[in-house]
Amino acid sequence: MNTSEHVGGAAVASGRLMDALNNNGVKAKMLVMNKESDNITVVGLSGRFRKQLHFLWERWCIFCHLHFHRDHLFEIDIANAGTDITRLREFKEADVIHLAWINQGFISLKGIKKILKSGKPVVWTMHDLWPATGICHYTRGCMAFKNVCQNCRLLPGDGSNNDLSTKIFKRKQELFRRSGIHFVSCSKWLGDQARQSALLTGMGLDVIPNPIDTKLYHPISKHEARLHSMLPEDKRIILFVSQRVTHERKGMPFFIDAINKLVALHPEMKDNTAVAILGSHSDEITGQLSLQSYPLGYVTNELEIISIYNSADVYVLPSLEDNLPNTIMEAMACGVPSVAFKTGGIPEMIDHQKNGYLAKYRDADDLAAGIHWALDEADKDAVAQNCLRKVSANYSQRTVAMKYIEVYNQAAAFKNYKI
């Protein structure tokens, strides 16, 4: 179960996991708030007005707690509204219930309680830290969740000793107690963070990466890719990808700074290198870069996205906090090295100067050095092969599906219910 079918990293990862399971002997369906495709294995909720009401009610409650300021309005989730999915035929037929990213009015804490009362085994994949904190998805260094969330930085005046984060934390604590939920983290980094939470004390937690379909994401001719993507054949391409490229957490200011510093050191790049930016608001960035730029906008067609990755010589993701970015996995599956900050789950993906470059955290100079390494110093063929080997060994559909099947059996055994 995931709020969205396509939008966001958790949606993409959940859809890929469903495909991986179906391709490896498990009959899996994905429940979403709003179905956007004609995929028969995806089920959408009915009741458009009710769904909108759930979404708006949660946002309104958060807005009130923010003293009617929009700051952090979509960084907070309290799960006080959602649909009771236990009445659905698909729920009744299921042997295991698998939660993913279920916020923004999709499933409430009360709804999760009903799921648990059904007696069915529950697995919950964490795509961020929200299941292990009070109200936030990324903690930005705050470690209050180790004991109890309070004095939350996302709330006006840094909250209080009994603020909204405290109340939701305690509701989760009561919900999780003796629940038997089996948690899965997509990265070791996130798993290590989550295990420190007082909410998850004594709970099962495994680390399983997201899968990728290597029959779909694979290297193709750069000439063909650039023709399809309408990108220049006579230049090296630096690629940046994000759902919304101006999102603070994705580190666009560091990308701009690194590119401009690199061009100042190597002015010849103005003639032989360009930047492609994939994601919404990409046209807002081009005027800030010293290189010719191609704003590609928000693209949903997967074949177009694959062509764009294959057009690139290097992929750059200066995220300030990230779990296990799908975009790095996608670039690697196409044989394209990634340059990123050493943070979150990214070091589990990038082997420094083998399949990419790990730059010092928040260091635009080292980010620039990484781009230069990928473009001018690395053995491109060897790096591309290392990328493909990494993906094949760790993120293939079969590898990931087998690990999840083991988790499902563990969760079912805990409920004395073997699948």
Where would I find each of the regions flagged by the language model?
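Conserved acidic donor-binding segment of nucleotide-sugar-dependent glycosyltransferases
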Residues: 352-353, 357-364, 373-378
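Nucleotide-activated donor-binding/catalytic signature segment of Leloir-type glycosyltransferases, i.e.
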Residues: 266-273, 279-306
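Conserved donor-binding/catalytic core segment of Leloir-type glycosyltransferases
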Residues: 232-250, 256-259
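Short alpha-helical donor nucleotide-sugar binding micro-motif in glycosyltransferases
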Residues: 307-312
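Short hydrophobic beta-strand element within catalytic cores of glycosyltransferases
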Residues: 337-340
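Aromatic "clamp/platform" in nucleotide-sugar-dependent glycosyltransferases that forms part
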Residues: 320
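A short, active-site helix/loop in glycosyltransferases that binds the activated sugar's phosphate group
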Residues: 133-138, 159-205, 212-216, 222
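A short, well-ordered alpha-helix in the C-terminal region of glycosyltransferases
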Residues: 366, 379-394, 400-406
